[in-house]
Structure formats: C-alpha cells, structure tokens
C-alpha cells in the first residue's frame, strides 16, 4: 500500500500544532497560577 507522504505530514501537523498550542497555554496558565 502506497502512503501519501504529504497527506501524512499534513495530518501530523494538523494534530500536533493544536496539541502543542494547548500544551503551551496550559503550561503558561499553570506557571501563573503557582
């Protein structure tokens, strides 16, 4: 089965970017809280 590299990269970015954004917001909020 041929894997579309561009589709895989696009999917990975689509998942990783919001996850990283939420993680950064969480860390900033946690550091401000304490």
From Swiss-Prot:
It is a single-pass membrane protein. The keyword DNA repair does not apply. Its main location: plastid. It comes from the Eukaryota. The keyword Chaperone does not apply. GO terms for biological process: photosynthesis, light reaction. Keywords: Chloroplast, Membrane, Photosynthesis, Photosystem II, Plastid, Reaction center, Thylakoid, Transmembrane, Transmembrane helix. It holds the Pfam family PsbM. The chain crosses the membrane at residues 5-25. Coiled coil: none annotated. GO terms for cellular component: chloroplast thylakoid membrane; photosystem II. InterPro entries: PSII_PsbM, PSII_PsbM_sf. It is found in: Plastid, Chloroplast thylakoid membrane. Belongs to the PsbM family. PANTHER family: PHOTOSYSTEM II REACTION CENTER PROTEIN M (PTHR35774:SF1). One of the components of the core complex of photosystem II (PSII). PSII is a light-driven water:plastoquinone oxidoreductase that uses light energy to abstract electrons from H(2)O, generating O(2) and a proton gradient subsequently used for ATP formation. It consists of a core antenna complex that captures photons, and an electron transfer chain that converts photonic excitation into a charge separation. This subunit is found at the monomer-monomer interface. PSII is composed of 1 copy each of membrane proteins PsbA, PsbB, PsbC, PsbD, PsbE, PsbF, PsbH, PsbI, PsbJ, PsbK, PsbL, PsbM, PsbT, PsbX, PsbY, PsbZ, Psb30/Ycf12, at least 3 peripheral proteins of the oxygen-evolving complex and a large number of cofactors. It forms dimeric complexes. This is Photosystem II reaction center protein M. The lineage of its organism: Eukaryota, Viridiplantae, Streptophyta, Embryophyta, Bryophyta.
